[in-house]
Amino acid sequence: MAHQAHAYHMVDPSPWPLTGAIAALLMTSGLAIWFHFHSTTLMTLGLILLLLTMYQWWRDIIREGTFQGHHTPPVQKGLRYGMILFITSEVFFFLGFFWAFYHSSLAPTPELGGCWPPTGITPLDPFEVPLLNTAVLLASGVTVTWAHHSIMEGERKQAIQSLALTILLGFYFTALQAMEYYEAPFTIADGVYGSTFFVATGFHGLHVIIGSTFLAVCLLRQIQYHFTSEHHFGFEAAAWYWHFVDVVWLFLYVSIYWWGS
């Protein structure tokens, strides 16, 4: 890139938005093919392309921001607005699932027996695994805030410990959720209850996995001395995302697990 005498965001042309879009297409088409034809080939191909895209896009942004100094204050401001808009779009994404749930549960059709949960569905006990999951996510919200304060105060070792703890809690949540799915007395095919339950909690689980990956990248960067007390927006974005995932879970827990049971 030629020398620039201004502070604005001028990045090199990047192939990653295109490869990311192709990966998303392959994964969504692959999901439909998996459901209907029991073949996971296309979905696996999409997942591999997505992982390659993520790795190389993250690598390029780290090069631009950390080593080339392109992330000037106006650029950081733009990135902040971008992250805020992204999280706002995610809020509306989950709003659709809550709408579907409340539409189905507040006025259950006669076909469901006129009651909620529908006749024949045994809901999960909200005070067993779901309550433990709530505690785990709330604890991870505390540890990620601890990591943020440690980075701002230049406490390198504490930041690494608290970030590692947050990631472990994220994986623990995912493992508990997988166990709950495995042992659930109903499936995604069990009418509107199964659909709304598994789609809403499943997408939330996917967001936990994405958030854990985001934080894991931040942990590796913190170990490599990439973050300073003034310059650590990559971590801040991950922390915002994690808090968003936390809040969505609280709404899911209160709505679907507790009230909906």
UniProtKB/Swiss-Prot annotation:
On the Mitochondrial intermembrane side, which residues?
A: 35-40, 106-128, 184-190, 257-261
Which sequence ranges are listed under topological domain Mitochondrial matrix? 1-15, 67-72, 153-155, 224-232
Name the enzyme's class: translocase
Q: Which residues cross the membrane?
A: 16-34, 41-66, 73-105, 129-152, 156-183, 191-223, 233-256
Superkingdom field: Eukaryota
Q: Which InterPro entries match?
A: Cyt_c/ubiquinol_Oxase_su3 (IPR024791), Cyt_c_oxase_su3_dom (IPR033945), Cyt_c_oxidase-like_su3 (IPR000298), Cyt_c_oxidase_su3-like_sf (IPR035973), Cyt_c_oxidase_su3_a-hlx (IPR013833)
Its localization reads: Mitochondrion inner membrane
- One GO-annotated biological process of the protein: mitochondrial electron transport, cytochrome c to oxygen
Xref: SUPFAM superfamilies = Cytochrome c oxidase subunit III-like (SSF81452)
Membrane topology recorded in Swiss-Prot or TrEMBL: Multi-pass membrane protein
Keywords attached to this Swiss-Prot or TrEMBL record, sorted alphabetically, are:
Membrane, Mitochondrion, Mitochondrion inner membrane, Translocase, Transmembrane, Transmembrane helix
Q: Name one Pfam family in it.
A: COX3
Q: What is this protein called?
A: Cytochrome c oxidase subunit 3
Q: Which organism is it from?
A: Carassius auratus (Goldfish)
